[in-house]
Each structure stands twice: as structure tokens, then as C-alpha cells.
Amino acid sequence: MAGYGAKGIRKVGAFRSGLEDKVSKQLESKGIKFEYEEWKVPYVIPASNHTYTPDFLLPNGIFVETKGLWESDDRKKHLLIREQHPELDIRIVFSSSRTKLYKGSPTSYGEFCEKHGIKFADKLIPAEWIKEPKKEVPFDRLKRKGGKK
């Protein structure tokens, strides 16, 4: 598991969290090739430009983000990206979609996703996602990590 402390996030091997590591092992065990944090999706927070790096890009064009904690700024970012890049299929795998948005919140991560039309799962990527037909990814609108567009 990633550790959080004053100096930031500690990596777990090649991955930044235990859940990312677990999902990568799932894909590897099924012989599925994937790219890990290789693509940056540009998005705009009003008056400033940013990029978002999804965790996994599956061969069928589905981006998968893994989340243990899903804080407010991250939820806002995902809504902005969905608004600015409706052509991208970005889905989330949570450690637990039943986790509440904040202490005392009546809303869980899963309920938030349902409200906003975000596909999600718990623990691992569902087999149905992996078996879905290929979707075109507009790579010309994305930037490869460590490089230009």
C-alpha cells in the first residue's frame, strides 16, 4: 500500500498504490497488455491548464483509474474532464465504492458515480469491461507522459 506522510506518497514497486499493483497483476494474469500512466489527458480548470494521468489504458480504449481515497478536488477534476472530453471512456475501480464522500456524508463514492454517469467497480476491473469492443481513443488530443502531444 502507498504510504502517506509529510514527504508525500511512497510508491509500491512500479505503482503508486497497492490497488494499482493488484489491478496490474489481474491484467497480467489474464495476458492483457496495458499501458500504465502513459497518457495525460489535458483539461482546463477555469483560467488554468492542467493534465490528468489515468492509471491504466486497456487495449480496447477504456481508461481505468484506481482510487482508495477520492477527495473533493479529485471528484471535481473528473467532472471537468468528463465535460471537456466526453469522447473518452474513463472508469474507476475503488477499494470500496461504499466509502462515504466525507465523514458523515450520506453519499458514497458509488452513489456519486451513479449520479454523474461514471462507470465504476470495486477491487478489480470487471471482466465485462475487458471484453468490451475496441473504442477509438483520440490520441491526437492527448499528450504522452514525458513528451509532447
Curated annotation (Swiss-Prot):
Stored Pfam families:
Phage_endo_I
Record keyword Transmembrane present:
no
Q: Which keywords label this protein?
A: Bacterial host gene expression shutoff by virus, Degradation of host chromosome by virus, DNA-binding, Endonuclease, Host gene expression shutoff by virus, Host-virus interaction, Hydrolase, Nuclease
Q: Which SUPFAM superfamilies match?
A: Restriction endonuclease-like
UniProt GO MF annotations: crossover junction DNA endonuclease activity; deoxyribonuclease IV (phage-T4-induced) activity; DNA binding; double-stranded DNA endonuclease activity
Q: Which domain of life is it from?
A: Viruses
The keyword Transmembrane helix is assigned to this record: no
Q: What class of enzyme is it?
A: hydrolase
Q: What InterPro entries does the annotation carry?
A: Phage_T7_Gp3_endoDNaseI, Restrct_endonuc-II-like
- The chain's disulfide connectivity reads none
GO terms under biological process: degradation of host chromosome by virus; DNA integration; symbiont-mediated suppression of host gene expression
Catalyzed reactions per annotation: Endonucleolytic cleavage to 5'-phosphooligonucleotide end-products
For this protein, the Enzyme Commission number is 3.1.21.2
According to the record's subunit comment, the protein's assembly and interactions are: Homodimer.
The entry's function note states: Junction-resolving enzyme that selectively binds and cleaves four-way (Holliday) DNA junctions present after viral genomic replication. These intermediates are created during DNA repair, processing of stalled replication forks and homologous genetic recombination. Introduces two nicks on the two non-crossing strands, at 5' sides of the junction. Also participates together with gp6 in the degradation of host chromosome to provide nucleotides for phage DNA synthesis.
Name of the protein this chain belongs to: Endonuclease I
Source organism per UniProt: Escherichia phage T7 (Bacteriophage T7)
The beginning of the lineage is:
Viruses, Duplodnaviria, Heunggongvirae, Uroviricota, Caudoviricetes
